[in-house]
């Protein structure tokens, strides 16, 4: 067993996020594990850029309301205690509603060292029109 000291909170880079986003690395995976886990906090209206993960991603909402959008125009609302999974290669974005902070636990796997592909591929920023699309509550 090993106790891991917390790292300093990081600010989300502008290339990857619109608005103010802060994250704490909870787990960065040590071989053979490739598990990654971050606690991510979004200011009202903040969101990721479009991106996808080679091995998929799971988002567990802790506080606020999360918005998760996909290329087909779907924007899901997820509330505290709810979990959303994004399959490998699915282009998506996630963020907070315009009027509240949102916090989620983001879980994903890194790629194998000999795989040659990035674990996350970052794309263009989400437009206001995409962000403001009608939302769906899925139960």
Identify the meaning behind each predicted range.
Residues 22, 36-53, 88:
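Conserved short histidine dyad/triad with adjacent acidic residue
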Residues 28, 52, 60, 78-80, ...:
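Conserved strand-loop elements at the edges of beta-sheets that form or border functional pockets
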Residues 39-43, 52-68, 107-110:
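Short, conserved beta-strand element in jelly-roll/cupin
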Residues 72-89:
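Short acidic-glycine-tyrosine-enriched beta hairpin
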Residues 48-50, 68-69, 86, 91-98:
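Short beta-strand His + acidic residue motifs that chelate non-heme Fe in jelly-roll/DSBH
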Residues 1-34, 119-139:
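A short, N-terminal "cap"/entry segment at the start of jelly-roll beta-barrel domains
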Residues 58, 85, 99-121:
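A short hydrophobic beta-strand segment most commonly corresponding to one strand
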Residues 31-33, 42-46, 65-67, 73, ...:
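Short, charged/polar surface micro-motifs in flexible loops or helix N-caps
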């Amino acid at each position: 067993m090993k106790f891991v000291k917390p790292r300093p909170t990081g600010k989300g880079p502008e290339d990857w996020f619109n608005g103010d986003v802060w994250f704490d690395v909870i787990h960065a995976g040590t071989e053979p594990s490739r598990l990654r886990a971050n606690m991510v906090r979004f200011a009202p209206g903040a969101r990721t850029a479009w991106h996808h993960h080679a091995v998929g991603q799971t988002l567990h909402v802790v506080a606020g309301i999360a918005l998760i959008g996909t290329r087909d125009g779907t924007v899901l609302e997820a509330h505290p205690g709810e979990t959303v999974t994004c399959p490998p290669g699915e282009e998506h974005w996630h963020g907070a509603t315009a009027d509240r902070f949102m916090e989620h636990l983001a879980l994903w796997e890194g790629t194998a060292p000999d795989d040659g592909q990035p674990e996350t591929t970052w794309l263009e920023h989400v437009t206001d029109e995409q962000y403001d699309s009608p939302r769906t509550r899925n139960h």
